[in-house]
Amino acid sequence: MAQVVATRSIQGSMLSPNGGSVSTRSEKLLKPASFAVKVLGNEAKRSGRVSVRSRRVVDTTVRSARVETEVIPVSPEDVPNREEQLERLLEMQQFGDTSVGMWSKPTVRRKTKIVCTVGPSTNTREMIWKLAEAGMNVARMNMSHGDHASHKKVIDLVKEYNAQTKDNTIAIMLDTKGPEVRSGDLPQPIMLDPGQEFTFTIERGVSTPSCVSVNYDDFVNDVEAGDMLLVDGGMMSFMVKSKTKDSVKCEVVDGGELKSRRHLNVRGKSATLPSITEKDWEDIKFGVENKVDFYAVSFVKDAQVVHELKKYLQNSGADIHVIVKIESADSIPNLHSIITASDGAMVARGDLGAELPIEEVPILQEEIINLCRSMGKAVIVATNMLESMIVHPTPTRAEVSDIAIAVREGADAVMLSGETAHGKFPLKAAGVMHTVALRTEATITSGEMPPNLGQAFKNHMSEMFAYHATMMSNTLGTSTVVFTRTGFMAILLSHYRPSGTIYAFTNEKKIQQRLALYQGVCPIYMEFTDDAEETFANALATLLKQGMVKKGEEIAIVQSGTQPIWRSQSTHNIQVRKV
């Protein structure tokens, strides 16, 4: 039986001057300005006056709040005066000034998730804890580097963090190496100049100033005279001039410093290698044994690869979601079937920009995001997002815009690679990503749903309830509480993008960690009782205790999905309650 319940009429909630929902929405819109107001406000306190610039920050935010809430009539009591607003903003602490105990607050406020690659710069207990404070939602292990022992250490540390922290959880992603073509080891980097001749050979162990080996036996067969060979996605480039049975002779087009084990691409071509190599299968087995949450599968060319991997996981009894990395020219014609077979996609722009004309990458990024959203799949934007912060403490303005564009286009998550794996400023990079995503989200109009989303789900009753719960959240300015054992309803709600946070309560630790990837979802572990009302009350008490909601705030409660929890009482249930 389907049931929709409200503690008071929806119309009353919209019109009541004491409902509090409008002021709550105003506060949420005001929060992103806290950094500017805090900095400027401190100057004002020292000088004994409020600066004109800080007034402008508040004025702009107030105008944004008015635009957002024009649909709902309000009385003067609903909107605090400017002095109260300024005082509240000055009292708010900027993220990073607080201790670990305050981590839940920025998590609730920021919807776009952050994937951080853990490497030599961050693979200690202290750094993983600090990355979590800085905003990391998913810890990624790049299997192209390191060994199983080093990755096991990171997995154990993340699991330790999850066990010790009640108000946050970090998911674990294992990124397969895939069929990469790489140059061999060099005793020291080789400096190459434009016009110079250079040779790549399939003979192992060659490393001279004019020739280096590659790790792929069919390399010679895959290239032809006139092909453009790119190193590390275009940091260096070579024109193929001729080839023999075991070597490829090139002319340096864009020079630079060639280091050991550099990634090689041929523009417009993909290597004729299987998408999942023998090493990948070893790494996948390692992931099963250590119960990771996600596989990011490199260089997926067709859906068959995904089906093969999922069959293996099913036979192994492993509940691990598969994220396909779109980074091969061969994957573009099969994009729809690949994403359909998967649980999500990663826009891996580095290799994608090497195999395709670079000007196509932003167009493909938007298309892949839109396709994933219309199909109800998670989508991650990756590669070079804050590349300059590997060596510099501040990002370029273009990088900041890049993050904002990904957030505005609707990505579930944005990813840091070398920035946190081996960069000099991993915590600052994560902090920049958090701040930019948070500020961008404050400017996005709620209620923008992807077209054809309903066609992606077979459970039409759950769809309907997710849609109406989203409408309720957007109309009343409320957050949403959902109870789930499988994560299905929380993921479905996430793709509808309600304006408020989705608090997903689950009694499964595995589901809690998985939901850490999805936009707008704050996963919380809680044991469910046999009584729905008691569980609802416990959930609201938890949110109140953690400071995630305020007393008197309205919350939409959803209980629906593929495996209803309290089947005897109601299969599908939406309520609006006051905390």
UniProtKB/Swiss-Prot annotation:
Belongs to the pyruvate kinase family. This is Plastidial pyruvate kinase 2. Oligomer of alpha and beta subunits. Keywords: ATP-binding, Chloroplast, Glycolysis, Kinase, Magnesium, Metal-binding, Mitochondrion, Nucleotide-binding, Plastid, Potassium, Pyruvate, Transferase, Transit peptide. Pathway: Carbohydrate degradation; glycolysis; pyruvate from D-glyceraldehyde 3-phosphate: step 5/5. Mg(2+) binds at residues 327, 351. GO terms for biological process: fatty acid biosynthetic process; lipid metabolic process; seed development; seed maturation. Pfam families: PK, PK_C. One of its GO terms (molecular function) is magnesium ion binding.
